[in-house]
């Protein structure tokens, strides 16, 4: 056996006392040793304590520090660190977490040239106009100063006209400051008095509340059909969905915290990092069912944590996946790019302490970068339907044969006619033996549509999802009297300049309205950004980030931003006009008052919006929400509208200049494209042609079907005839009611089925009568014979 003194300290992992006797250990080397080695040394020394000499014991007692001699702290561990529970996670997470970002999307963002800078165009025009007005103003100020030395200030009618001209021109900001205090006091009085819908008994004027709509024959006729539950549909639901007893066998045991759900430690760390300590009701009900591998149809109010309800069980199941071969096992589909980007951010935050890989596949981002990521076979793909089909058909080495879980977020939107063909293409390609989960704030109850997804006895988990808003939301309505519909923009400008001045999302039905409002706000000096489908992805992300970071006060958006978008600190939502349906209204106003916070939703409604407003007020009353009428000064509104009307020529010039710059940019792009075609002709022609599952004609047809379902064909008829009469509106409402199949036929006393049967019977009788006439009296050919008999 070799003697111990020949060993070197660097060759041994554990040092013995004999080694220490022969080879003295330097202090620097001991201090540099990691804690693991020191712990093992301590264990060894305990075993050999009996053989140690008193001098050696004294030497060991001298080492009192944790890391080495002299107790020098090397800063490896924070002295204030504590293993915290719920309180620590809550304190650290909620205060430090700043919301969901777009880092995942920026990685795959294509390098694009900056588009037309609308702010720069507006700024140039304002400076030009301000330059002229300041020259006139300085001359007037000098004259006023000379007069002020000799005479007192007298506000007569002439002076009032001069002040009105100043206010009417470029002194917009000063007007807002002067009237701001008065308006704030009026707002506080209205909030304290709580101008409730039920107490609105004032005389008819422009300031009357829209929250108490007058009864209408169509409304009275449709109320009964809306409230009644179709027995046949209810029977279908019972046969389609799994019984509630199977979904939740132990109803008493409701999860009060994530610890009781037996989630893995990495997921618990991810939850603590974002400040999630207690599950929301939808999460407490759906996560245990999803962990069992069952299909789920979930619905809950906006801002209730539906994304976490399907992300958490997915992460928990993927922790136990086979890891030898990378495999794509989960696909999450969402209707809009922004919602998919946000879902990707939520998932990556929650999975920060796991080895689960995610890929974002949405339109507007680099196709090649996404293809490279898909070749690595990530565990989860978060995508929009169009881009997912593109990769499914055209990306090499990408297969969906191993997909085990499919999630449709905002499922009711995905089931509409606009997405029907794309969704059908995806569902027929994915494996049949999969777990499917559907979530939305306004989940459809139509079994016929849910059957298309291929669900297998799904568990129905509904938590306050019957088209309800949260109770912390104050809903305000501003009524436009007949004849004042053309002053809608004046009402909006008055609200934004005097009432709600920051963190406001304004929704429009059409892109052109949002863009025009963007120009008007710029001319009025209101900082804003727009968000709609005509913008490229870089511009869309930039607009959301500017609004989120507080660089702009208003976000002018279409319904592109109405679903799922979670922007921290949104105080107010304004509807420029009431949306097409109550479902869209619920999603719009759900951008504020999220996760228990307070918020305000204001809707500018005219007589044509009566039906949706009535439904919103009725739903709000049913759940005890606060419905408030907002009264505005018609004089100030008219003044603002006049100011906006006088801007029409300037607005048209700005839009024309913007159009010219876009055309120039397009020509430059075409020139660059031609140069690339010449330089890289062989490579471009050698690429395989990308394919799609439907023709251009089918694409247009599906888009039109989506528009018709959304607008109820009203907009198309408006384009043809200019304006819809009350008769046309009633006819379209009845047609929509029949198409939905949710109510009875109200035109007569008989049901629709009976009337169809009667019509069919009458048609059959008519055909039989015609056939009988043909058989009994055949038509004679030639001229009729004369009365005199045959000729001889």
From Swiss-Prot:
UniProt-annotated binding residues for ATP: 300-307
EC number: 3.6.4.13
Coiled coil, from the record: 633-681
GO cellular component labels: cytosol; nucleolus
Protein name, as recorded: ATP-dependent RNA helicase DRS1
Family from the record: Belongs to the DEAD box helicase family. DDX27/DRS1 subfamily.
Skewed-composition ranges (Acidic residues): 17-30, 54-63, 70-98, 142-164, 175-205, 220-233
Biased composition (Basic residues): 35-49, 757-768, 780-792
Ranges of biased composition (kind: Basic and acidic residues): 675-756
